[in-house]
A protein has these predicted regions:
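Acidic donor-binding segment of Leloir-type glycosyltransferases
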Residues: 19-72
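Short beta-strand-to-loop acidic/aromatic patch adjacent to the donor-nucleotide binding site
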Residues: 86, 94-108
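Catalytic-site signature of metal-activated, phosphate-bearing donor transferases
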Residues: 79-84, 106-278
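Glycine-rich, basic loop-to-helix element that forms the pyrophosphate-binding segment
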Residues: 74-90
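Residue-level signal for alpha-helix termini/capping positions
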Residues: 63, 91-92, 120
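N-proximal low-complexity "stem/linker" segments adjacent to membrane-targeting elements
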Residues: 1-23, 30
Length: 278
């Protein structure tokens, strides 16, 4: 199994995400974008968002784990094309499973052990859904998986052939969406209590959040005034509901929870002690 990261400007969380998952997989593939996606940039937007320290982090990790970390660098217009580059390398390496991980997704060791065990017990499964805790403006606040409607597909079995009337035919694996591969087999969803990931997508500084909103695939769908009305206003209105930037009910509310369940590696992160990340 290979963990495949497709990243650009992920210096805040990439290193902890990679180190957390390294022991659970045979290979880590880091697909580093050297510039932001152009397909989602708003018309007339010339904001450059130059590279941060992500490339240095990638190079350092690859040097530290030369037999385990593969690096691909390039410029991809869209997230789909970026994903396809990672899939291609995964297939070239002869991997049986593709573990999709974004640069702000961190796993716990006990959850990863359970994931590996479950995969071994379910060879008939082609797609594994792993829900997440999505953090909001702080490590203290999150949209827990129990109220989060998103059901992210994260692990795909790489079946190269499919049988029709008992005859094997080549099956071309490809991404159908940013988080969906056309794998063959059943779908298994992990109960969040058994396995979930910690998604720090909205636990960012104001500048980083603006960059995310300008360059991610749903940039054109962001509701007008959301940044001022929701993001900036939330610290003074922490009971606010329906806070997602493109489809408000997707984030019903951010709930304050204990930090006790966080992956231990997060306890050394610079944001750990902050009530609100600024």
């Amino acid at each position: 199994m290979a963990a495949v990261f497709c990243v650009y400007n992920e210096e805040e969380y990439l290193e902890v995400a990679v180190r957390a998952i390294l022991p659970a997989v045979e290979q880590v593939i880091l697909c580093l974008g050297l510039s932001p996606y152009t397909a989602y940039r708003a018309e007339g937007s010339l904001e450059p968002y130059p590279p941060d320290r992500t490339e240095k982090i990638v190079d350092r990790l690859a040097a530290e784990f030369p037999g385990k970390i593969q690096v691909i660098k390039g410029n991809w217009p869209s997230q789909m094309e970026h994903r396809e580059a990672g899939l291609k390398r995964c297939l070239e390496l002869g991997m049986d499973y593709h573990f999709l991980v974004d640069g702000d997704e961190v796993y716990r060791e006990d959850h990863l052990r359970h994931i590996r065990k479950t995969i071994e017990q379910h060879p008939e499964t082609g797609t594994f859904i792993i829900k997440c805790h999505t953090f909001w403006r702080s490590f203290h606040y999150r949209i827990p998986p129990e109220i989060l409607t998103w059901r992210p597909r994260r692990i795909f079995k790489l079946t190269r052939n499919r049988r029709i009337l008992g005859i094997p035919f080549p099956h071309k694996l490809k991404f159908l969406g940013a988080n969906d591969l056309n794998g063959i087999g059943t779908i298994y969803e992990f109960p969040p209590a058994e396995a979930a990931f910690y998604h720090f997508s909205y636990a960012r500084s104001a500048d980083r959040l603006k960059e995310k909103l300008a360059t991610f695939p749903h940039a054109h769908q962001i509701l007008g005034g959301w940044y001022e009305r929701v993001w900036r206003a939330w610290p003074q209105q922490r009971e606010m509901e329906n806070i997602h930037p493109t489809d408000p009910p997707k984030f019903p509310r951010a709930v304050r929870q204990s930090l006790d369940d966080l992956p231990p590696v997060m306890k050394t992160h610079p944001y750990y002690g902050m009530d609100i990340i600024v």
